[in-house]
Amino acid sequence: MSKVQEILEAVKGLTVLELSELVKAFEEEFGVSAAAPVAVAAAPGAAAAPAAPAAAEEEQTEFDVILTAVGDKKVNVIKVVREITGLGLKEAKDLVDGAPKPVKEKVSKEEAAAIKAKLTEAGATVEVK
């Protein structure tokens, strides 16, 4: 049995918690992030046709942040929308009242995640496309 097969057999016997610890140990030891390899590793298990759209999604560099619902903290959401977009009070209120509407379009993944976090913290429901 080759070393690779031995390691594979050992990994098969691990619990989910142990696998999580193994991933963290790899990240610390080699200074890498397991986020991308996990997404790539999931694609080969899919059928051949759906694998192509999955690859296209991974390569997506621009995202739209959509405000889908306001919740009961409308004033806080308006404040955050103004902060994010630079809109005036009336424009921000109109955007919030007209939900679902895009708050910001064609932003990076990191910026989209930050915007989503701010709006969610303010009480809004947000979708990133």
UniProtKB/Swiss-Prot annotation:
Q: Which InterPro entries match?
A: Ribosomal_bL12, Ribosomal_bL12_C, Ribosomal_bL12_C/ClpS-like, Ribosomal_bL12_oligo, Ribosomal_bL12_oligo_N_sf
**Gene Ontology terms describing biological process:** translation
Summary of the function given for this chain in its UniProt record = Forms part of the ribosomal stalk which helps the ribosome interact with GTP-bound translation factors. Is thus essential for accurate translation.
- This protein is called Large ribosomal subunit protein bL12
> Which SUPFAM superfamilies has this protein been placed in?
ClpS-like, Ribosomal protein L7/12, oligomerisation (N-terminal) domain
How the protein assembles, per its UniProt entry? Homodimer. Part of the ribosomal stalk of the 50S ribosomal subunit. Forms a multimeric L10(L12)X complex, where L10 forms an elongated spine to which 2 to 4 L12 dimers bind in a sequential fashion. Binds GTP-bound translation factors.
Which lineage is the organism of this entry classified under, starting from the top rank? Bacteria, Bacillati, Bacillota, Clostridia, Eubacteriales
Q: Which Gene Ontology MF annotations are present?
A: mRNA binding; structural constituent of ribosome
